[in-house]
Regions:
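Juxtamembrane helix-entry segments on the extracytoplasmic side of multipass membrane proteins
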Residues: 16-21, 43-52, 82-90, 163-187, ...
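Juxtamembrane helix-loop-helix junctions in multi-pass membrane proteins
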Residues: 29-60, 78-80, 110, 116, ...
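Specific transmembrane alpha-helical segments of multi-pass solute transporters/efflux pumps
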Residues: 29-35, 63-124, 160, 244-262
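Hydrophobic/small/kink-forming positions within alpha-helical transmembrane segments
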Residues: 29-32, 36, 63, 97-102, ...
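Hydrophobic/aromatic residues within transmembrane alpha-helices
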Residues: 41, 50, 54, 111, ...
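Helix-helix packing/entry segments at the starts of transmembrane helices
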Residues: 51-53, 101, 119-126, 193-215, ...
Length: 343
């Protein structure tokens, strides 16, 4: 018997619609463009400054949308048995912000000093695999044969895209750096599942809170950085602004919205297509050469995505109990915590 659970869009969970594919395409475009912008930013600006700046810019963009739409953030503190405590919504936003933004944003610049970008792309392809397992364990997202085969094909496609040189580089690259990249991919997956289980807060408000928390947590790192701001070029500054507005700010809202509509597993498919988009964008902007393996990888990845979505899997009612505003759990959360859902 099919599940009657419905998501925040008011439709059965597991049904992927046209808007979800549009959201996925936006995530891929923003995420893939970040590599080109990072390349321009790091030419004259320290990585830590880039990480903190893009978080604050992204938070400012989303907060501006929140104010323009006259939405409200939930109260920071909520009454508890032993006195005021951190509001449940803010606790969730803090966890997702630190786990999915602050820590990975610092891990990758450090690790890429010892691991080339091709190998980094392969390790990022572990994120959907982590998400598949974590979603099954903690978010009631089913594991089906179609998903296993599709996610496996997606991973193979990324390996083909990056080429044999990336795989051979694993032997000479720092073991600690490679482990750090795997851990960062795990954190991204964990943050996606945490966002899936978030209290019923509007996606725009939730995404703004996530970036605010991430920016605050990341800011102390600037005390240990040599700014050398007199060496910053206009191109690098514009790249940082672009990183903050698009891959960090607007992308955060789209990611949260897509996770709540279609699930963490579907959103994670972007990690298979983002490296491909980055390669194509690099060819367009930096005249990087496209090889036959690029088009072979495209075919394998697209087949993998098709297989994962060939037969939507039913989900349990628990999957979206805390996300659907009309659910009993949502009403209990709203009553207990006075979360503003933006209505």
């Amino acid at each position: 018997m099919p599940s009657k659970a419905r998501n925040i869009a008011g439709r059965p969970i597991g049904r992927v619609e046209t808007r979800d594919w549009i959201y996925l395409a936006i995530i891929i475009a923003f995420g893939g463009s970040s590599f080109a912008m990072i390349r321009g930013a790091v030419e004259t600006i320290p990585p830590a400054v880039i990480a903190v700046s893009r978080l604050w810019i992204g938070a400012a963009v989303l907060c501006a949308f929140v104010v323009a739409k006259r939405r409200k953030f939930p109260k920071f503190l909520a009454p508890g048995e032993n006195g005021p405590r951190l509001h449940r919504a803010w606790g969730s936003m803090l966890a997702v912000g630190v786990v999915g933004n602050t820590v990975p944003f610092f891990i990758f610049p450090w690790a890429q000093q010892y691991v080339d970008s091709g190998l980094a792309g392969i390790y990022m392809a572990f994120m959907p695999i982590w998400t598949l397992g974590l979603g099954f364990l903690f978010a009631d997202e089913s594991i089906t044969p179609q998903k296993v085969v599709g996610f496996g094909l997606g991973f193979v496609g990324v390996v083909i895209l990056m080429g044999p040189d990336a795989m051979s580089g694993a032997a000479s690259a720092s073991t600690l750096a490679q482990a750090a990249m795997l851990f960062a991919a795990f954190l991204y997956a964990g943050s996606a599942v945490l966002a899936r289980r978030a209290p019923p807060v509007r996606p725009r408000v939730y995404a703004a809170g996530v970036l605010l928390c991430a920016a605050v947590a990341a800011t102390p790192s600037l005390f240990f950085v040599d700014f050398a701001s007199d060496q910053w070029s206009l191109t690098s500054i514009l790249c940082v602004i672009g990183l903050g507005v698009f891959p960090t700010g607007l992308n955060a809202f789209v990611i949260v919205a897509l996770i709540r509509r279609a699930g963490a597993g579907f959103m994670a498919l972007a990690n298979y297509l983002t490296p491909l988009w980055a390669v194509l964008l690099g060819a367009a902007i930096y005249a990087e050469r496209l090889s036959l393996s690029t088009f072979l990888a495209l075919g394998v990845i697209l087949i993998g995505v098709f297989v994962t979505q060939r037969r939507p899997a039913p989900q349990s009612d628990l999957d979206n109990a805390s996300l659907h505003p009309d659910s009993a759990a949502a009403h209990r959360n709203l009553a207990d915590n006075a979360v503003d859902d933006g209505k």
